[in-house]
């Protein structure tokens, strides 16, 4: 399978990596009135793109760069590289519910990617953490094994940052799906800039990677976990 087809699989919402049960915070935003329609959805998507979207994309690209380099060097320090990458993701996710969700998504992605592109790297990921490595590390590993570039992997990450909440908003608010996807597409120039910034940062020290978050969304994520009735996991 070509790298392009692999990226299309990884970016497809039907790829069984668990993303369909998450709203990327939209369920909380709808409940507390931050997202009520198309205009506020666009604001939310832009905010997510420039905060968590940038952070995750940089972590994904950094994972591709470092895992590729370690494979070229013979995998002698692979376990340490995975642990270091995973720790950088952990440090950038403050709320326990979001940390748990990221590990579940990473574990699921590792499992399905191992079936699609069998490679010993996935066994190393599974051995690195009992609950699974964080999703950006797993996505980076899947990109490496399938032959995708840091730019391609970061683009998939940004695609998810936009489309996960956009599609959840359709379900929660009954928005016009054509309008919702058009909003996401209209942000393409900004998304391209985020990908470029993420990949540029990924070539530097891990400690200097972006660490942008949305504090209000993080607080809402903790509250969301206490709800008795909810449609999405996050």
Language-model features: where?
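Glycine/small-residue-rich interface belts in oligomeric ring/scaffold proteins
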Residues: 3-74
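A short glycine/serine-rich beta->alpha loop
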Residues: 7-16, 43-50, 91-98, 124-129, ...
């Amino acid at each position: 399978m070509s790298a392009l087809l692999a990226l299309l699989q990884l970016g497809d919402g039907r790829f069984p990596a668990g993303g369909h049960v998450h709203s990327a915070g939209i369920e909380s935003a709808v409940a507390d009135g931050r997202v009520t329609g198309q205009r506020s959805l666009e604001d939310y998507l832009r905010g997510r793109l420039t905060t968590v979207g940038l952070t995750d994309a940089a972590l994904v690209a950094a994972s591709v760069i470092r895992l590729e380099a370690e494979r070229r060097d013979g995998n002698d320090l692979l376990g340490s590289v995975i642990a270091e990458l995973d720790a950088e993701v952990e440090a950038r996710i403050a709320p326990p519910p979001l940390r748990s969700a990221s590990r579940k998504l990473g574990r699921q992605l590792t499992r399905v990617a191992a079936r699609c592109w069998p490679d010993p790297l996935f066994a190393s990921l599974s051995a690195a953490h009992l609950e699974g490595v964080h999703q950006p590390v797993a996505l980076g590993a899947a990109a490496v094994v399938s032959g995708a570039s840091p730019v391609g992997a970061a683009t998939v990450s940004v695609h998810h940052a936009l489309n996960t909440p956009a599609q959840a908003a359709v379900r929660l608010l009954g928005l016009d799906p054509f309008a919702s996807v058009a909003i996401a597409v209209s942000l393409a120039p900004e998304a391209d800039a985020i990908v470029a910034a993420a990949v540029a940062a990924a070539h530097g020290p891990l400690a200097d990677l972006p660490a942008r978050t949305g504090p209000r969304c993080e607080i809402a994520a903790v509250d969301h976990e206490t709800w008795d009735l909810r449609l999405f996991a996050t």
